[in-house]
């Protein structure tokens, strides 16, 4: 699946990632924070249980349910490891 990848910095210099199917807007319920485009039209295997290096769990299920998939607060990426 081709997706657009957004990133935002959280507390303690850790990053969260949000992916949406290519060309789709971030849904309104997730658009209230400062997301920055990281990459556009990236091929990812959304069938994976865990999408590394963005640390997103169950991307296919999240996209089906919400229209996007996001890094859990438990898996935020430290700045030195952030893609």
Label each PLM-derived region with a short phrase.
Residues 1-18:
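Short, extreme N-terminal segment that most often corresponds to the first beta-strand
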Residues 2, 23, 41-43:
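Intrinsically disordered, low-complexity peptide-like regions
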Residues 6-8, 22, 73:
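Structured loops at beta-to-helix junctions and adjacent beta-edge loops in soluble globular domains
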Residues 16-39:
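A short, structured beta-strand/loop element
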Residues 31, 37-83:
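Low-complexity intrinsically disordered segments
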